[in-house]
Amino acid sequence: MIEKPSNHQRHFLTPHLARYLLFFAACCFSAPSFSEQTHWQLPNYIVDSFVEIALKNEYSKVVSPLRKWQQPIYYFIEHRTADEELHTKITNLHLAHLSNITGLKIIPTDNADKANLTIIFSTEKQLAQELKSDFNLLDQRQILKFSRQSVCLANFATKSDNSIHKAVVIIPVDRARAHAKLLSCVVEELTQVLGLPNDSDNVFPSIFNDKSHNDYLSGLDYLLLSLLYHPQIKAGMKQKKVKPILRNIIQSPKFKQQIEQANYLVNQQGIYLLLN
C-alpha cells in the first residue's frame, strides 16, 4: 500500500494508490481446553498476527496507525446482476456475525445516500468501469491490472484521526463463482473493511492468508476482530503503543476464555449457518 498525503481525510488502496485501500480475495467445532492450545492461541502469536494484519499493508513496507470504525455502519447492497435474494442473505448473515463479534452497530439501509458501506454485486464485464466510478481510480494501468487480476475488491477511506468513515466492496459474481470464491469473497472483503486490510502467509489459519485455504472466519480471525474492537484499542494507535495493550488484554481471564472457545464460537453464526 502506498500512501499519498491529502489535506483532511485519507483514503487507502492496496496494491498501490494513494489513501485508498484495495483488497483482493485471491475447524473444528469443539472448544479446546487451554492446555491443548495450538500455535495460533499463543499470546505472542496473536499479538504478532494482529500487527501483521491490522497495521501492515499488502504492497508497502510502511507500518500504518491502527484503523477502525468509530461510528455505526449503514450498509447498502447494490445489485447489478441476478440472484439478489442469495446475495442479500449471505451479506446480512456475515455482517450480523461481524457485528456480534465486534460490538459494532452494522445496520442495513435502503437509502444509498445514507450508507457508509456500499456492497456491489456485479459482473466482470462491468468491473473496469466500476473501478472508475465506484473506486474513483484514474490510472488506466491500475484499472487494467485490477480488473484482470482481482477476484473481488474493496476499499475504505479514513479521516485524519484514522477512523474509517466510508467503504466500498465490489464482487464480480461470475468471476467469483468461476473461482469458487463467492462466499469467501463476501467474508474476506467485508471483514477487511472493518480495519484488517493486510494479507499475510505468516498468519494462519486465517481468511487473510491465501495459502491457508480458509474461506470463512477462523478462530484466529475471531480473536483479531475482538481485539481490534476492544475498548482499549483506539484508532490512530501505532505499533509501539498498541502491542503492550494487546498483551494485557490477552492475559485477562475473560480473553483467555475467548481464546479457548474461539473455534467453537466463530462456527455458531454467520455463513457457517449455511454449512451446518
Locations of regions flagged by a protein language model:
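Disordered inhibitory propeptide/activation segment of secreted metzincin zinc metalloprotease zymogens
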Residues: 34-74, 81-83, 100, 150-159, ...
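Short, aliphatic-rich beta-strand segments
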Residues: 74-78, 169-171
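Metzincin-family zinc-dependent endopeptidase catalytic domain
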Residues: 87-187, 192-193, 197-201
